[in-house]
C-alpha cells in the first residue's frame, strides 16, 4: 500500500489604502526645518481551526508579536502621519494520497462520547439523498461491495501470488544441493528503523533546504526577528508549544499522539470495510494478516491539530514566516521503503494493480411507473325556475320511460367496467368519470336525473361525500343532513362482503313503484334480507323480476363503499345490471377522490421530488391547476365555471444485484 502526504500552499497578499494625516503648515526650504522621523511596525498571527475538529468553543488562536520601533513624541509646527496595513494569508492544505481502504467520512475525528442514537444513515457513504442519478451511479460503483465467497477467494489467490513473488520466500527457499548441509543462512535483514546513514541523509537534506532558503530570502527584518524571539520566550513561559521558531520562521510542531482507544476504534472501522480496488503488498502482509494496513491510514486522526484547511493570516511580515512541518514518521517510512528497494532490487510491490472481476449476473433493474390525470369541469347556469323543474319529474311513468331509453344502449356490455373490459361508451374512454362531470352544488333534481344508480339526491358518491352531505362509515351509520326526520334517519346499514344481492322483502307489498328512484327512506319498512348465493335469482311471483335477468350473473366485486340502495334496489331488470357497473365506477371514483382531492379556486401548483433509494431512485411529480370564475355564456346568461386539472406521476427505478437478493 502506498500513501504519502502532499500539501498545497497558497499565499495571498493584499494591502489597505494608505492613510495620510497632516497637521499644521508644511515648512518651506527657507525655514531650515529640523525633521524627526519614526517608524512603527505591528505584527499579529491568527491561526484558525474549524470548531468541529477540536471540540472547543474558540476555534482560533491569536499570537500577538507586539510593536517594533517608536514614534517621536515631540511637538512641531507640521506633523504628517502615513499609515498602511499589509496582510498576508498562507493557506496550507494537507492531503493524503493513499490506496488504503479509508472511509470517506474519516476526515472527522470520531467522538467516543457520541452515542449511537445520533448515528444517522445520512452521515455515511451509503446515503445518496439529493443526488442526481449519474452521481448516484458513480457513488455506487465506488462503494464497498459485500464480502462474498468469490471475492474472498479471489483476494486470497492474489495474496498467495504476491507471496510467491516476495523476497522472503526467496530467502527461505532451500535448494536441492543444500538438503544435507547445516543451516548457515544469514539473519533476515529486513528494514532497519534507526539507520545511522538514513539520519545523516535527513540532516543533509535539511541543511540544503536551509541554504536554499537563505539564498532566496529577501532583506532581513532584524526588528521583526528580535520581536519573534521575544514572543517565543513569552510563549515558552506560557507553556504553549504548538509552534517552534527556527531562525525567523515559525514551524508547526507535531500534534499529540492519538489516544489508543480511538486508534482501536478506527482500526476496527477500517478493517471491517472493503473497497472496490483491494490491493495488497508484501509489506502489508509482514505487518498484519489482513488486507488493510491500518497504521498508514490513521495518521490524520489528530485530536488537536489536523484540519483539512488551516488558515493563517499574518500582518506586516516581509517574507513567509509560517511553514508547514511535514509529519516525519510517514516521510521516514517512505525513505526507508525507497532505500530498501535500492539495497535489495526486487519486484516492485508499490504498483497498484486493480483486477476487476466481471460478475455473472450484472444487475436487475426494477422499474415502476404510474401516471394519473384527472380533469373536472363544472359549468353552472343561473336558473330562475328551480322549483318548477324540481317537481316536474315526480311521476313514476316519466322516470321509467327515461330509464328504459337511457339503459337501452348498455345491454351489450357492462357500461362502466372500463378497466376490466377495455371497451366503453363514447363518453367514457378514460378510467375516471367522464360521462358528465358537473359537480352539483345545489342539487337540482333535473340535473341529477338519469345519471346512474347514485343519482337520486347527488351527482356521485364521491361528490356528495366531498361536499359533506353524506357521511359514510363502512359498517356504521349512513347519516344524511336531510331526511333526519324520517324513520330511517339513523338506521344502521350493513356493508355486504359477499357477492350476494341484498333485497327488501315481501314482494313489494307496500306498493312502491318499480322505478321510483327517489330516496324514499320513509317507505322502507321491511328489513334487509340476503339471498343465499346458491339460489337462482329468478324467484316466484312479483312484477319486479324481468325475463332478461333469467340467468345467474355473478357480480365481479363485493359492494364495499355504497351498499345502500334507492328505495330497495328499485327493480331487478336492466337496472340491476347497470347497478353493478355503476357500483364499480363509483368505487373507483371514490378511491380516486380520496387519493387526489380536486382543488378549488385559482391554483397553479407543481410538486416535484426525487428521492434516493438503496440501489436506485424514485421521482414523484404532481401538478394541480384550477381556476374558477363567472363569465357570460353564448345566450348571455351568467355561467359559473370551475375547472380543475391534476396530473400525478410516480416513477421508481431500482437496481438489485444478486448479493442483495440472496440475503
From Swiss-Prot:
Keyword set, alphabetical order: Cell junction, Cell membrane, Cytoplasm, Cytoskeleton, Membrane
GO cellular component: apical plasma membrane; basal plasma membrane; cytoplasm; cytoskeleton; hemidesmosome
Domain of life assignment: Eukaryota
Basic and acidic residues bias (residue ranges): 367-380, 620-640, 649-663
TM regions (residue ranges): none
Phenotype seen when the gene is deleted: Embryonic lethal with failed embryonic morphogenesis. Disrupted intracellular structural integrity from the 2-fold stage of embryogenesis resulting in thickening of the epidermis, abnormal intermediate filament distribution and detachment and collapse of muscle from the cell body, particularly in the head, tail and midbody. RNAi-mediated knockdown results in developmental defects whereby 95% embryos do not undergo morphogenesis and arrest before the two-fold stage with abnormal head and tail structures and reduced motility within the eggshell.
Composition skew (Polar residues), residue ranges: 1-15, 517-526
Ranges annotated as biased composition (Basic residues): 381-400
Region (Disordered): 1-78, 367-430, 517-546, 597-663
One annotated GO biological process: hemidesmosome assembly
Tissue spec: Isoform a: Expressed in the uterus, the vulva, the rectum, mechanosensory neurons and in head and tail neurons. Isoform e: Expressed in spermatheca and weakly in the vulva. Isoform f: Expressed in spermatheca and weakly in the vulva. Isoform i: Expressed in spermatheca and weakly in the vulva.
Signal peptide bounds: none
Self-association state and partner proteins as the record states: Interacts with vab-10 (via plankin domain).
Protein name: Protein pat-12
Organism: Caenorhabditis elegans
Organism placement in taxonomy: Eukaryota, Metazoa, Ecdysozoa, Nematoda, Chromadorea
Gene, per the UniProt record: pat-12
Amino acid at each position: 500500500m502506498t500513501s504519502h502526504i502532499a500539501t498545497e500552499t497558497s499565499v495571498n497578499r493584499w494591502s489597505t489604502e494608505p492613510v495620510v494625516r497632516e497637521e499644521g503648515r508644511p515648512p518651506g526650504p527657507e525655514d531650515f526645518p529640523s525633521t524627526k522621523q519614526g517608524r512603527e511596525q505591528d505584527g499579529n498571527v491568527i491561526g484558525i481551526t474549524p470548531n468541529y475538529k477540536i471540540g472547543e468553543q474558540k476555534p482560533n488562536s491569536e499570537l500577538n508579536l507586539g510593536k517594533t520601533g517608536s514614534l517621536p513624541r515631540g511637538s512641531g509646527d507640521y506633523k504628517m502621519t502615513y499609515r498602511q496595513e499589509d496582510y498576508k494569508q498562507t493557506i496550507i492544505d494537507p492531503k493524503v494520497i493513499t490506496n488504503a481502504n479509508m472511509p470517506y467520512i474519516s476526515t472527522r475525528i470520531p467522538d467516543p462520547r457520541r452515542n449511537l442514537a445520533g448515528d444517522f444513515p445520512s452521515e455515511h457513504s451509503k446515503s445518496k439523498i439529493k443526488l442526481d442519478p449519474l452521481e448516484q451511479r458513480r457513488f455506487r460503483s465506488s462503494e464497498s461491495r459485500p464480502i462474498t465467497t468469490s471475492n474472498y477467494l479471489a483476494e486470497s489467490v492474489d495474496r498467495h501470488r504476491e507471496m510467491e513473488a516476495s523476497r522472503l520466500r526467496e530467502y527461505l527457499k532451500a535448494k536441492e544441493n543444500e538438503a544435507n548441509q547445516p543451516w548457515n543462512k544469514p539473519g533476515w535483514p529486513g528494514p532497519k528503523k534507526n539507520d545511522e546513514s538514513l539520519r545523516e541523509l535527513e540532516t543533509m537534506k535539511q541543511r540544503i533546504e536551509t541554504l536554499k532558503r537563505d539564498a532566496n530570502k529577501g532583506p532581513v527584518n532584524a526588528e521583526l526577528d528580535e520581536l519573534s524571539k521575544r514572543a517565543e520566550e513569552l510563549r515558552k513561559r506560557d507553556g504553549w508549544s504548538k509552534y517552534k521558531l527556527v531562525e525567523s520562521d515559525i514551524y508547526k510542531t507535531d500534534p499529540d499522539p492519538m489516544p489508543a482507544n480511538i486508534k482501536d476504534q478506527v482500526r476496527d472501522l477500517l478493517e471491517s470495510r472493503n473497497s472496490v480496488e483491494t490491493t495488497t503488498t508484501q509489506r502489508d502482509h509482514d505487518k498484519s494478516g489482513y488486507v488493510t494496513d491500518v497504521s498508514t491510514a490513521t495518521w490524520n486522526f489528530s485530536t488537536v491539530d489536523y484540519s483539512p484547511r488551516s488558515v493563517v493570516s499574518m500582518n506586516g511580515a516581509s517574507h513567509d514566516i509560517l511553514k508547514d512541518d511535514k509529519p516525519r514518521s510517514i516521510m521516514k517510512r517512505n525513505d526507508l521503503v525507497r532505500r530498501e528497494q535500492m539495497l535489495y532490487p526486487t519486484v516492485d510491490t508499490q504498483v497498484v494493480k486493480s483486477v476487476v472481476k466481471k460478475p455473472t449476473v450484472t444487475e436487475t433493474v426494477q422499474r415502476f411507473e404510474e401516471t394519473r390525470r384527472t380533469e373536472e369541469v363544472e359549468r353552472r347556469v343561473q336558473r330562475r325556475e328551480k322549483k318548477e323543474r324540481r317537481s316536474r319529474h315526480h311521476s313514476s311513468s316519466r322516470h321509467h320511460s327515461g330509464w328504459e331509453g337511457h339503459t337501452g344502449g348498455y345491454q351489450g356490455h357492462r357500461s362502466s367496467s372500463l378497466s376490466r373490459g377495455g371497451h366503453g361508451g363514447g363518453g367514457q374512454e378514460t378510467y375516471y368519470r367522464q360521462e358528465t362531470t358537473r359537480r352539483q352544488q345545489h342539487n337540482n333534481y333535473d340535473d341529477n336525473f338519469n345519471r346512474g344508480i347514485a343519482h337520486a339526491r347527488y351527482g356521485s358518491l364521491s361528490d356528495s361525500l366531498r361536499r359533506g352531505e353524506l357521511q359514510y362509515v363502512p359498517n356504521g351509520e349512513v347519516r344524511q343532513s336531510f331526511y333526519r326526520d324520517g324513520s330511517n334517519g339513523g338506521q344502521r346499514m350493513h356493508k355486504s362482503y359477499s357477492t350476494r344481492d341484498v333485497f327488501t322483502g315481501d314482494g313489494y307489498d307496500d306498493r312502491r313503484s318499480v322505478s321510483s328512484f327517489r330516496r324514499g327512506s320513509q317507505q322502507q319498512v321491511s328489513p334487509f334480507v340476503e339471498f343465499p348465493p346458491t339460489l337462482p335469482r329468478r324467484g316466484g311471483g312479483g312484477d319486479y323480476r324481468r325475463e332478461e335477468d333469467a340467468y345467474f350473473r355473478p357480480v365481479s366485486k363485493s359492494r364495499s363503499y355504497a351498499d345502500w340502495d334507492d328505495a330497495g334496489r328499485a327493480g331487478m331488470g336492466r337496472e340491476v345490471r347497470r347497478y353493478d357497473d355503476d357500483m364499480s365506477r363509483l368505487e373507483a371514483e371514490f378511491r380516486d377522490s380520496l387519493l387526489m382531492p380536486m382543488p378549488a379556486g385559482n391554483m397553479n401548483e407543481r410538486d416535484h421530488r426525487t428521492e434516493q433509494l438503496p440501489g436506485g431512485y424514485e421521482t414523484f411529480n404532481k401538478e394541480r391547476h384550477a381556476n374558477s370564475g363567472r363569465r357570460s355564456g353564448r345566450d348571455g346568461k351568467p355561467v359559473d365555471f370551475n375547472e380543475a386539472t391534476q396530473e400525478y406521476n410516480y416513477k421508481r427505478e431500482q437496481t438489485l444485484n444478486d448479493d442483495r437478493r440472496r440475503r
